[in-house]
C-alpha cells in the first residue's frame, strides 16, 4: 500500500465511521421519539378518525410543535450555538413530525393505513410470516423461498418478536417507527452534503411529501425518503473532475455562501459529496449501501435508483473524456502534454460505478440468493404477473409542477431551479438526473405495454414528488437569497421569508391527514386480528378467525407454520402464520408457485364426484396438498372466490367462484366444522 493510499484510507475510515456513528445516534433518537409518542397516543381512548375531528386537531398541534423544534434547530445552527443541541432538536423534530402526522390519526386503531385491505393484506401476511420465524420463507406458499425482498419485513418481524407482538399488530408501530428512522437518516446524510440549516429545511420538505404520498407503502417510503440525498451522494462519488486530475468545470466548483450572514453561519459549504482527501470513496461506499438497502426493500425503486446512478456514471465518464480533450488543446504560451488515450479519463467514474454495483450486489445477495438459486434449478413454470397493471396514471406522464396547488407551486419552483442551476450546481445535476431517470422509466413503461407488460411507472409518483419538492426547497431558499441581495439586504426580509416558508409548510402538513383520509378510514373500518373494528361498529367475518384458528390447531394437531390451508379469505393468513395453498391474486404470488396451475387444479378438485376421488387427487397433488379448507358456506355447497389476471384490462383482476359440493367431504377422512359464515374442513392424516 502506497503512502497516497494510506492517506486516503484513513480519511475514508474516519468519514464512514463518523457518519455511521451519527446515523446510529440519530436513529436511536427517532426510535425513542416514535416509541414515546405511540405509547402516549395509545393511553387515551380516542374517537375514530372517520367520525370525529379530534385526532385531526391534535395532529395539527403536534405538527406545530415539531415545526417549532426544527425552527429552533435552524436558529441555533445559524447562530453557531450548541451544535449538539441543534442536532438533537433536528432529529427529534423530524421524528416527532412523522410520528404525530401518522400516529395521531391512527391512534384509535391497531391497524396501519389501509388496514388489511387490498395490497396491505399481503404486506401484513409477509410481516406475520417473518414474525413467526426469521427464516426466509414465502409469505404464502410452503417450501418456496420468498420472491419479494424481505428486508423491511424481516427487520419488522424481529422487532415484533422481541416486543412479543403479533405481526399484524406490530405493523402500525413498526411502519411509523421505520419512517421516523428513515427521515432522520436522510437528515444526517443531507448534513454531510450541504450546510446544516439547509439540510433541516430540505429534509422537512421531502419528509412531508413522502408522508402524504408514499406512507401507505411504508417499506417503499423508506427508499423515497433516502433517495434525494443518496442521488446527490452518488453524483459526488462519480463526477469528481478535480480528484481525477482533470480541469474542473463550473459544475464541480463548490457553492459557497454568498452573503455576510451566511458566511458567519457556515464556515464552509460542501460542494462535493465527500471531502477530496477521501477521493470520493466514502460516497462510493454510501451509494452502494443505499442501493443494497433498496435491493432488500423494494425491487422497483432499486431499478429506478440503479438506472439513475448508471446514467450518472455514463454522464460522468463522458464529461471526464471531454475535459481530457480540452486539456490537450494547445493554448497560447503552453505546451500540450500527452498522457495517453483520452478514453482512459472515463475509467475512474466507471470503476467507481462498478464498485457501487458490487457493494449493492453483495447486500442484495442476502435476500435474493435463495430465490435465484431455486429459479435456476426449478422446472416449475413461471407464473408471475407482478408487472401486469396499467392504471390511467401509468399511461400518462406525471406533471405535478403544472397542478394548481401548494405542492404544484413547490414542484414548479423545483423544476425552474433544476433548469437554471443545471450547469452550476452539483445538487441540481444530481436531482435532475434522478427526475430524468423517472421520466425515461415512465416512457419505457408505456412502450413495453406493446410487449404485454409494464414497468409499473404509476408507482413512481412518490419519488418524483420527493425529488421535485427537494429541488423546490433549494429553489425557494436560493431564490429568496437572490431577492435579498437584489433588494440590498433589507433588515426584515429574511424573517418575512422564514415566516412564509413556515406557514406554507404547516398548510401542507396539516392537509396530509386529508390526503390520506381513505387509507386512514379503512384502518378504522377493517376488522383487526382481535376481531374488532376500531370505529366500534359491528365487525366483519374476520371476527370468527380466532375461533377458526383454535379449531384448526385442535383438529390438525400441528403448529400453524406446518399447516397448509386452502382459502379465498386470505386475510386469515395475514393474522395467523398458516401457509396458503393459493395466493390472493397472481400479482402477489411467487412466480415459482405456478399460480395458474394451482388454480386449474382447484377447479378440477371441485368437479370430482366422490370423497374417494378427492382423497386420491389430494395425494397426487404436485404441490403440498392442503391440510385444511376454509370455505364460505352457501347452502349445500362450499365456495371459494378466486381471482385471475385479465391484464391489460383495468381493473386487472377478475373474481370468480369455485363451488365444492358439501357431499364431497362426507367421509371419515374429512372433519367439517361450521363457524359463522365459514366451513372449516380439515384433512385427517
Report residues per predicted region.
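Start-transfer (signal-anchor) and selected internal transmembrane alpha helices
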Residues: 1-33, 40-107
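Membrane-helix boundary/interfacial segments in multi-pass membrane proteins
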Residues: 48-59, 112, 164, 212-222, ...
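Membrane-interface junctions at the ends of membrane-embedded or membrane-associated helices
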Residues: 76-80, 236-283, 315-348, 469-495
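Internal/C-terminal transmembrane anchor helices
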Residues: 87-99, 356-360, 364, 489-515
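Membrane-embedded helix bundles of polyisoprenyl
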Residues: 94-101, 179-318
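Active-site lumenal/periplasmic loops and adjacent helix-entry segments of GT-C-fold
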Residues: 101-224, 534
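Transmembrane catalytic cores of multi-pass membrane glycosyltransferases
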Residues: 112, 119, 218-223, 292-432
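Short periplasmic/luminal acceptor-recognition loop of GT-C membrane glycosyltransferases, typified by
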Residues: 504-606, 617-648, 668-683
Amino acid at each position: 500500500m502506497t503512502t497516497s493510499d494510506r492517506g486516503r484510507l484513513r480519511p475514508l475510515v474516519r468519514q464512514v465511521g463518523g457518519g455511521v456513528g451519527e446515523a446510529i445516534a440519530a436513529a436511536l433518537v427517532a426510535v425513542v421519539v416514535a416509541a414515546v409518542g405511540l405509547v402516549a397516543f395509545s393511553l387515551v381512548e380516542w374517537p375514530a378518525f372517520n367520525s370525529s375531528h379530534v385526532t385531526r386537531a391534535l395532529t395539527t398541534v403536534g405538527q406545530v410543535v415539531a415545526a417549532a423544534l426544527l425552527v429552533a434547530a435552524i436558529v441555533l445552527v445559524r447562530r453557531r450555538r450548541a451544535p449538539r443541541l441543534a442536532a438533537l432538536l433536528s432529529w427529534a423534530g423530524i421524528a416527532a413530525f412523522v410520528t404525530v402526522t401518522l400516529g395521531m390519526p391512527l391512534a384509535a386503531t391497531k391497524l396501519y393505513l389501509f388496514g388489511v385491505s387490498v395490497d396491505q393484506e399481503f404486506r401484513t401476511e409477509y410481516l406475520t410470516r417473518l414474525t413467526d420465524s426469521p427464516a426466509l420463507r414465502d409469505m404464502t406458499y410452503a417450501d418456496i423461498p420468498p420472491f419479494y425482498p424481505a428486508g423491511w419485513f424481516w427487520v419488522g418481524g424481529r422487532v415484533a418478536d422481541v416486543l412479543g407482538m403479533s405481526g399484524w399488530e406490530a405493523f402500525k408501530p413498526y411502519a411509523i417507527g421505520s419512517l421516523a428512522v428513515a427521515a432522520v437518516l436522510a437528515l444526517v446524510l443531507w448534513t454531510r452534503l450541504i450546510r446544516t440549516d439547509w439540510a433541516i429545511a430540505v429534509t422537512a420538505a421531502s419528509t412531508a411529501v413522502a408522508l402524504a404520498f408514499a406512507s401507505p407503502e411504508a417499506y417503499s417510503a423508506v427508499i423515497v425518503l433516502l433517495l434525494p440525498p443518496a442521488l446527490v451522494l452518488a453524483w459526488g462519488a462519480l463526477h469528481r473532475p478535480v480528484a481525477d486530475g482533470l480541469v474542473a468545470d463550473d459544475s464541480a466548483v463548490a457553492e459557497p455562501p454568498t452573503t455576510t450572514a451566511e458566511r458567519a453561519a457556515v464556515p464552509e459549504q460542501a460542494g462535493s459529496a465527500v471531502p477530496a482527501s477521501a477521493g470520493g470513496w466514502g460516497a462510493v461506499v454510501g451509494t452502494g449501501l443505499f442501493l443494497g438497502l433498496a435491493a432488500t426493500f423494494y425491487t422497483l425503486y432499486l431499478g429506478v435508483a440503479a438506472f439513475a446512478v448508471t446514467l450518472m456514471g455514463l454522464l460522468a465518464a463522458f464529461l471526464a473524456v471531454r475535459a481530457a480533450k480540452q486539456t490537450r488543446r494547445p493554448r497560447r504560451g503552453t505546451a500540450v502534454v500527452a498522457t495517453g488515450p483520452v478514453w482512459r479519463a472515463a475509467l475512474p467514474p466507471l470503476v467507481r460505478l462498478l464498485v457501487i454495483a458490487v457493494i449493492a450486489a453483495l447486500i442484495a445477495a442476502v435476500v435474493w440468493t435463495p430465490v435465484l438459486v431455486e429459479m435456476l434449478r426449478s422446472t416449475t413454470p413461471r407464473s408471475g404477473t407482478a408487472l401486469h397493471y396499467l392504471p390511467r396514471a401509468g399511461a400518462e406522464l406525471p406533471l405535478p409542477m403544472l397542478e394548481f396547488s401548494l405542492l404544484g407551486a413547490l414542484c414548479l419552483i423545483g423544476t425552474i431551479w433544476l433548469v437554471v442551476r443545471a450547469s452550476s450546481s452539483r445538487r441540481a445535476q444530481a436531482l435532475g438526473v434522478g427526475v430524468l431517470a423517472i421520466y425515461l422509466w415512465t416512457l419505457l413503461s408505456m412502450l413495453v405495454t406493446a410487449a404485454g407488460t409494464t414497468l409499473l411507472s404509476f408507482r413512481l409518483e412518490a419519488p418524483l414528488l420527493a425529488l421535485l419538492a427537494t429541488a423546490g426547497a433549494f429553489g425557494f431558499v436560493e431564490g429568496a437569497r437572490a431577492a435579498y441581495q437584489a433588494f440590498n439586504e433589507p433588515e426584515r426580509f429574511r424573517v418575512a421569508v422564514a415566516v412564509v416558508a413556515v406557514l406554507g409548510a404547516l398548510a401542507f402538513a396539516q392537509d396530509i391527514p386529508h390526503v390520506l383520509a381513505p387509507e386512514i378510514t379503512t384502518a378504522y373500518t377493517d376488522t383487526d386480528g382481535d376481531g374488532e373494528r376500531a370505529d366500534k361498529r359491528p365487525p366483519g367475518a374476520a371476527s370468527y378467525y380466532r375461533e377458526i384458528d383454535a379449531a384448526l390447531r385442535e383438529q390438525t394437531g400441528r403448529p400453524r407454520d406446518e399447516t397448509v390451508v386452502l382459502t379465498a379469505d386470505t386475510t386469515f393468513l395475514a393474522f395467523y402464520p398458516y401457509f396458503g395453498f393459493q395466493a390472493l391474486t397472481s400479482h402477489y404470488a411467487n412466480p415459482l408457485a405456478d399460480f395458474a396451475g394451482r388454480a386449474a387444479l382447484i377447479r378440477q378438485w371441485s368437479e370430482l364426484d366422490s370423497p374417494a376421488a378427492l382423497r386420491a387427487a389430494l395425494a397426487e397433488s404436485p404441490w403440498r396438498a392442503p391440510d385444511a379448507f376454509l370455505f364460505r358456506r352457501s347452502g349445500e355447497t362450499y365456495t371459494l372466490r378466486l381471482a385471475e389476471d385479465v391484464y391489460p384490462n383495468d381493473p386487472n383482476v377478475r373474481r370468480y367462484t369455485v363451488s365444492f359440493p358439501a357431499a364431497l367431504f362426507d367421509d371419515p377422512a374429512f372433519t367439517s366444522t361450521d363457524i359463522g359464515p365459514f366451513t372449516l374442513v380439515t384433512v385427517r392424516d
